[in-house]
Amino acid sequence: TADFSPLSREKFEAYIGKKVAKFPEDIFVWKKNTDGKFITQPGKYFQKWMEWRTKNITDFMALARKEVKAANPKVSFGTYTGAWYPSYYEVGVNFASKKYDPAKDFSWATPEYKNYGYAELIDLYATGNYYTDITIEEYKKTNRNIWNETDSQAQAGTWYCVEGSCQHLRQILKDNKFMGGILVDQFYDNPGKLSETIEMNLRRSDGLMVFDIVHII
């Protein structure tokens, strides 16, 4: 769902029911800002494109779940994503509950975006709380910008500490459970904090994922 191929154009135009005159400019283009860094410049169909992308992923998740359960109904169907929901739309993924409406919180979401949350499709969900600030109080002291691997630009806010991430995830996932993940190599030089992030994830989420377990075996 990431390309600007002729097929994607055709499918997107069918989805919105109209032709896109300037493609991909009416979706978005990369422009240099005053600092010489590339940033996205959204076009008039940017939000609908993001909606369409996440619909494709959620449709795939529904099909994949159907196949898995047909093979063995007892098998848990699950997934992993990063925890940084405010920018995760950039990779076409809406791992939230359909009961949560991101359009009330984020400018990139359409009113229809909520229809394509896939939390209710999965039995097992792990997410990456890969932050060195553990508590909200600690984050507010550092106010650090975080640039996750999927981000087009740096992010900031209480989403970007372990405690805050877990709180926000509870809000967007509603009654769906999640396991908070830790990135072990962030704490090689500070094992005390490794213990803190493990404790916080166990306290605020529904389990723990260790990424990558081979780092410590």
Label each PLM-derived region with a short phrase.
Residues 1-133, 137-138, 142-143:
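Polysaccharide-binding and catalytic clefts of secreted carbohydrate-active enzymes
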